[in-house]
Amino acid sequence: MKAVIQRVCSASVVVEGEVVGEIGQGILVLLGVEKGDDEAKASWLAEKIISLRIFGDDSDKMNLSLRDVGGSLLAVSQFTLAGNCAKGRRPSFDSAAPPEEGRRLYDHFVQAVRAKGVATATGIFQADMRVSLVNDGPVTFILER
């Protein structure tokens, strides 16, 4: 399971011209589910992301977590994170989880974040989405489990 996380001032996702999810200060998560991933990995990533101290304190030192600042999380499924670009010019998605498994684990991740009391918005699984964000920093991390 892979996640690209970005600290944002705001972020939103639009499907078919309609805003389906938006947040203010918080973290945008692009989540890719691969074959062999399970609930334990999704739960670990959820806890890791909301606990990472990537927000500035009074001294502007990265010392506060999403929970500490009362921020929100926008979760967007992105199977292309499972893409392998090592050979040729077209990515291979052989390592991506099948859609039904990807949806199940994406939903598990979202529920794990919500269970921790974090306000969470989402995109729509398998939809063609337009994601907008105002990156804060920029601060971006890649997490893999």
UniProtKB/Swiss-Prot annotation:
Please give the chief subcellular localization of this protein. cytoplasm
Q: Name one Pfam family in it.
A: Tyr_Deacylase
GO CC annotation: what is one?
cytoplasm
Name any Gene Ontology BP term.
D-amino acid catabolic process
Q: Where in the cell is it found?
A: Cytoplasm
What is the E.C. number? 3.1.1.96
Which InterPro entries is this protein grouped with?
Daa-tRNA_deacyls_DTD, DTD-like_sf
Where on this chain is Gly-cisPro motif, important for rejection of L-amino acids (motif)? 137-138
Catalysed reactions, as listed in the record: glycyl-tRNA(Ala) + H2O = tRNA(Ala) + glycine + H(+); a D-aminoacyl-tRNA + H2O = a tRNA + a D-alpha-amino acid + H(+)
Alphabetically ordered keywords of this record: Cytoplasm, Hydrolase, RNA-binding, tRNA-binding
Please give the Gene Ontology molecular function terms for this protein.
Answer: D-tyrosyl-tRNA(Tyr) deacylase activity; Gly-tRNA(Ala) deacylase activity; Ser(Gly)-tRNA(Ala) hydrolase activity; tRNA binding
User: Which Gene3D superfamilies did the record assign?
Assistant: D-tyrosyl-tRNA(Tyr) deacylase
Q: Which family does it belong to?
A: Belongs to the DTD family.
| Xref: HAMAP family | Deacylase_Dtd (MF_00518)
PANTHER family from the entry?
A: D-AMINOACYL-TRNA DEACYLASE 1, D-TYROSYL-TRNA TYR DEACYLASE
Note on domains (UniProt): A Gly-cisPro motif from one monomer fits into the active site of the other monomer to allow specific chiral rejection of L-amino acids.
How this chain assembles, per its entry, is: Homodimer.
Which protein is depicted? D-aminoacyl-tRNA deacylase
Gene for this protein?
dtd
